[in-house]
């Protein structure tokens, strides 16, 4: 078992402790202050019974959804573009100058023909200050979920520059989805500290577990409306959105902030 997973489970245990109310109030308020979190859409920091409850806070003011394909989460755009071919594999960038194999990222969640015309992608990084829940970016059907075991490196920009193939090395869950235009994937990449990802539609998907093995689960008639909640990270992480070529036209710039509900593609 890797040190990153052991340390993440320890951090998760501590984050889940419900301290006496006054102590928890101080912990939460200092966390909010340190990360400069805007709490205007959420309950007051003192109302969360643990640090993990603060991490996974729910919106108190519903977001309005813009027209088109919306961001599944809050975060920062780290990279956006089209894949390139090398040695008959499709490659994308985690960050400028650092490429990885899309086939390795997706593992068993694709058929070869689904990638033959190329792919477009966007990487959304969720920092510790961001809203940690993720949602359906459009009316869609989830066809399958593929769990791939791995380590839990931090996924911030500094580590992406230092560690090659980081997304491929980290634990992740890939959702294969379909809308009226075609196939796309939502890849939820685990990260150091806690490392937990939860999916509302399948509680049996367990991440950062002591015993783990790769698997794929297929679903029938698992439909979601645009904006419907899919699950949440515990602490920050990354969502990689990959679509068949021509399915989506991304209107994004690297480095820009994004909010769940805002349009990211036509």
Swiss-Prot record:
Catalytic activity, EC: 4.1.1.65
GO biological process annotation, one example: phosphatidylethanolamine biosynthetic process
Recorded GO CC terms: plasma membrane
Cofactors, names only: pyruvate
Alphabetized Pfam families for the sequence: PS_Dcarbxylase
InterPro entries: ERO1-like_sf, PS_Dcarbxylase, PSD-B, PSD_type1_pro
Post-translational modification note: Is synthesized initially as an inactive proenzyme. Formation of the active enzyme involves a self-maturation process in which the active site pyruvoyl group is generated from an internal serine residue via an autocatalytic post-translational modification. Two non-identical subunits are generated from the proenzyme in this reaction, and the pyruvate is formed at the N-terminus of the alpha chain, which is derived from the carboxyl end of the proenzyme.
Entry annotated with the keyword Cell membrane: yes
Residues the record marks as active site: 74, 135, 237
Transmembrane intervals: none
Catalytic reaction list: a 1,2-diacyl-sn-glycero-3-phospho-L-serine + H(+) = a 1,2-diacyl-sn-glycero-3-phosphoethanolamine + CO2
Class in the EC hierarchy, top level: lyase
Keywords: Cell membrane, Decarboxylase, Lipid biosynthesis, Lipid metabolism, Lyase, Membrane, Phospholipid biosynthesis, Phospholipid metabolism, Pyruvate, Zymogen
Cell compartment(s), UniProt: Cell membrane
Single GO MF annotation: phosphatidylserine decarboxylase activity
Residue positions where Pyruvic acid (Ser) is found in the record: 237
UniProt record similarity statement: Belongs to the phosphatidylserine decarboxylase family. PSD-B subfamily. Prokaryotic type I sub-subfamily.
NCBIfam families xrefs: PRK03934.1 (NF003038), PS_decarb (TIGR00163)
Function per UniProt: Catalyzes the formation of phosphatidylethanolamine (PtdEtn) from phosphatidylserine (PtdSer).
Quaternary structure annotation from Swiss-Prot or TrEMBL: Heterodimer of a large membrane-associated beta subunit and a small pyruvoyl-containing alpha subunit.
Protein's name according to its UniProt entry: Phosphatidylserine decarboxylase proenzyme
